[in-house]
A protein has these predicted regions:
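Functionally critical loop-and-helix segments that line ligand-binding/catalytic clefts
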Residues: 38-59, 64-65, 70, 250-325
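Substrate-binding cleft of extracellular glycoside hydrolase catalytic domains
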Residues: 38-218, 228
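Aromatic-lined carbohydrate-recognition surfaces of secreted/lumenal glycan-active proteins
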Residues: 227-248
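Long, charged/polar, surface-exposed segments that mediate recognition or autoinhibition
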Residues: 217, 224, 238
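Glycine-rich, charge-decorated loop segments at or immediately adjacent to ligand/cofactor-binding or catalytic sites
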Residues: 115-122, 242-254
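A generic structural motif
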Residues: 80-82, 234-239, 266-271
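Secretory targeting and sorting signals
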Residues: 1-33
Length: 325
């Protein structure tokens, strides 16, 4: 939560100031002091950090109303577009409802992922083949003879993996061409949901031990297409482990398109997180959102929701005017 301005609190407790000489220094009335202190506290709250949460499926209108008025001041929520690696559609059509309630939003598009593999890399699998096997058999007479028999035996072979039939999310789909196609999908769905021109779309890129060239090509192409279209702004959800590399890559793409401002980054890292910290405390100057508590369950106003907890620089991370005004 935002840090309290104790000078403001002190103003509520003092109606006048007595110095050592015994002279009373005139001060505003207690009513004026309360008004001034309240204004300063409100300023602190509006300046952030702003607490938000994300959850896989839409919790329901009643749940969102309950949480907005709860004791814990969540101000914004992750808004999942249906996407290749997040096919749930429960958030669709809820933008206006959430906006009317007063929720800020962060638009999320979960694109293709590597899932710990390298796109196009051949993998070893076990296959069974029939082989003619030479056997030596001892007869009753004691004589040994050679015979041949067909047997099923395991062998290791290298194969080029394929996406499962009907799948929309696969390591094998990670490529520049798919990055462009997924950007078009994200643009169309953001527009269909009624988000204003200039809305920030966060491309969800999950943690990778190594970032294959195909993945770098994928998110670069995604970025270039969103910029080329011009209706929305590209942004990125990334793990702290990969954030610096991704940032450098997309900055190059943006610079080549004449964009000089930093792209918004939403960084995931549990280390050192607290809800009164600001996003840059995660360790990156370009961080605008920090996700630090994952897979927790909270109950507010009697409504229980499994969530990830985030802090942001803005009360509505995807808004055109992200101060929510």
């Amino acid at each position: 939560m935002p840090k309290t301005d104790w000078r403001s609190i002190l103003a509520l407790l003092t109606g006048g100031l007595i110095v050592s000489t015994g002279t009373t220094i005139p001060t505003p009335s207690i009513g004026d002091a309360v008004t001034a202190a309240s204004a300063r506290i409100a300023d602190n709250l509006s300046n952030g950090p702003h607490l938000g949460f994300d959850t896989f499926a839409y919790p329901g209108d009643d749940a969102m109303r309950a949480w907005l008025t709860a004791d814990k001041p969540y101000k914004w929520v992750g808004y999942y577009l249906s996407a290749p690696c997040h096919t749930d559609t429960t958030w669709e059509g809820k933008r206006e409802t959430l906006s009317n309630m007063g929720w800020g939003m962060a638009v999320i598009y979960v694109g293709q992922q590597t899932w710990g593999r390298t796109p196009g890399e051949r993998i070893a699998v076990t296959r069974y083949v029939t082989k003619r096997v030479r056997q030596t058999v001892k007869l009753k007479s004691g004589k040994r003879v050679v015979r041949y028999a067909n047997k099923r035996v395991p062998v290791r072979v290298l194969v080029s993996p394929r996406a499962s039939p009907g799948s929309t999310c696969s390591t094998q789909f990670v490529s520049a061409a798919r990055g462009t196609a997924d950007a078009n999908d994200a643009i169309a769905k953001t527009a269909r949901e009624g988000f204003a021109s200039g809305t920030v779309i966060f491309l969800d890129i999950e943690r990778m031990e190594n970032v294959p060239k195909a993945m770098r090509d994928y998110y670069r192409a995604w970025t270039a297409r969103v910029v080329e279209d011009g209706r929305f702004r590209p942004a990125y959800y990334a793990h702290n482990f990969n954030a610096q590399l991704i940032y450098g890559d997309v900055k190059e793409v943006l610079a080549s398109a004449g964009v000089t401002s930093d792209p918004p980054f939403w960084i995931a890292s549990e280390r050192g997180f607290a809800i009164d910290k600001v996003p840059t405390d995660v360790g990156h100057a370009f961080a605008q959102v920090w996700q630090g508590l994952l897979d927790v369950v909270e109950t507010h106003n009697g409504v229980r929701i499994p969530i990830d907890v985030n802090v942001a620089d803005f009360p509505s991370p995807s808004a055109v005017d992200r101060n929510g005004e």
